[in-house]
Amino acid sequence: MEVQRKTVPVKKASKNGFLKSVLVFTLIVSFSVLLLGGYWIFKGLAPRPVEVSGPNGEVLMTKSSISGGQAVFQKYALMDYGTILGHGSYMGPDYTAEALKIYTEGMQDFKAEAQYGKRFKQLSDEKQSTIRNHVIREMRKNRYDRPSDTLKLTDAQVYGLHQVRAHYRKVFTKGDGWGLEPGLIKESHMPERDRAWVDSEDQITQISDFIFWTAWLSSTLRPGDDITYTNNWPYDEDAGNTMSFAAVWWSGASVTILILFVGIILFVFYRYKLGMKEAYQEGAFPVFDLDKQPLTASQVKTGKYFAVVSLLFFVQAMFGALLAHYYIEPDSFFGIDWIRELLPFSISKGFHLQLAIFWIATSWLGMGIFAAPLVGGREPKRQGLLVDILFWALIVLVGGSMVGEWLGAKGFLGNNWFLFGHQGMEYIELGRFWQVILALGMLIWLFIVFRGIKSGLKRESDKGGLIHLLFYSSIAIPLFYGAAFFFNPGTNITMSDFWRWWIIHLWVEGIFEVFAVVVIGFLLVQMNLVTKKSTVRTIYFQLTILLGSGVIGIGHHYYYNGSSEVWIGLGSVFSCLEVIPLTLLVLEAYEQYKMMKDGGHHFPYKATFWFLISTAIWNLVGAGVLGFLINLPAVSYFEHGQFLTPAHGHGAMMGVYGMFAIAVWLYTLRNITKKEAWNDKWLKIACWSLNIGLFGMVFINLLPVGFLQLKKAFEDGYWSSRAPEFLQQDVVQTLLTWRAVPDTIFLAGIVILVVFSIRALFHLRKPTHREGEALPVKDIASDE
């Protein structure tokens, strides 16, 4: 390995100037469109009127009761049980679609009784058709008056509202007969006065009003338009909701544009040779002697990070297994009632999601800490102390947030539910206080990384070089998490969802992907496997097409959540284009496989490369193919919020980000663990177990159920595909039961990683260099 002690940069002309300009231009345009689209959403939000009254002037609802109902919905973690406007979890119903069905049937019965003295279902087909058409016209007319900020409901609509209230009064007191516990919402959970976010009146009435309001906006036309606030979603012909022309047109247009850009991107890729080039000659593969590799105290301290990561991964998977079981036996766990009472579906789902983010992010943070001295060339003073502080901060964060989420969802925190408890938004369950701790933890990590790579940044003359790209991508991790602070329970649910997807799509799926692309490039250069020059060019190309498609591609989450129709066009086109960079990663996987083969039997990083190859394959299959399947507006219209969504979610979250987290986790452990304690054979078994198990989950369980659910929605209306009766069908129950097989295979792989990582703690190498001492490592800052 080369020893580089130079600290004075040599000023040279900027490299890759054109590629840099294209990337910067792409970022400016993409985020401008996204923010402008967000402003468009804000201006077109469905109103929450100051007063909602009936034909006689009696006040039925207020803005406070609607907003308070949203807070109640979030406080009891109902987004981790069912869905609202199609977003959330899949055990319970979609509350919007369910309420719309009840609201519509209530209006039909009211009209039938008024005109014929009979209930709607007792009428002849001809009379039913007359009533149905009358109800559709009445409910789709927008009676909101903007100057007075009031909404008038007709007699039939008022009756429909009362039916919705009666239904949810029963559900939230006696349970829903499926997975929702009786007596979930209690007035004793909140103080009588000065409630945080929740209105002073009865909480069940408030949540009923909120759910009814989502049904109203899904069936009421936008002013001056012929589609509803939700672009005619959910599909319910009795309510007049059918697929819009925009959904059909943009589905076809997006595929056409995809085909065009596949050709363009592939031409550019091959014409300008934008792939990574090997840095070694055939037969002269780099030799790695890990016993002689320099090691610092802070690097050794990352060992405990990965031991905790393995345990978090195991616990997260066990919660996943519990959730899968609840679909078979929703009211207990093999007859043990106290487990369901202690860990109901909603709380377990929140833990499952949060732990996934925690273990994946912690793995990436640990690798960043390890890499910092390699980049900077020395260990900063007291770096190890900062690493220890961050470690214990993460322990407090994970433990504290989980306890808080449980206490909040169970109603024990009173007015502090949002601050310390369960925030109630999928993927952002942890309370606001814990969010602050998480953000501070990421800033501490960024400071640790900056201290480690600071001298490398100074030495690298190119401000767009590999070290700078690593630093910029590190900054983006805490920066983009800031979107989680832009909304609260009082924010309109559609606007909250706009910012929530910044966390899920932009932060997890976008910035994590950016960091992964840069880190993979860094690792390959650090190991002398590829040239720095070709790697930097490749990274710029990948980031341009990744962010150019992905930033605006967030719009496929905005099709039917109350956002403006423009997002159907933007989201469909750019989400289709997201497939292209993911496809190109398969070419990278082949190159990685070839490098591993060239390394032969003695190549020490085989386990890392197995998981890097897994990452690339799942990037195409899980994120690309399965994402493309559900992102077409015409498919999403019927599928939105069904089992095909978690099929994509598992393939992308675990298949891409999870597999990559394991890759960097094993890379770091390989460098800090004694050679005699390493066993690639067991890690190979773990890799196959995780991939086979994940494949089984997705293709044997989630996809088949999702296709059946899609068919049910198309034939009988969306609400029917989300009713408990669908999940209770024999064929669905059989598929859900057989999931135990791939789940068990998957868990076996995790157990191997847990044992391996904890065992590694007792076989760590000793630091070879002290703080401030120069490390004999390849100088990534130097020009080739």
Describe the predicted segments one by one.
Residues 44-246:
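Soluble extramembrane regions of membrane proteins in the secretory/endomembrane system
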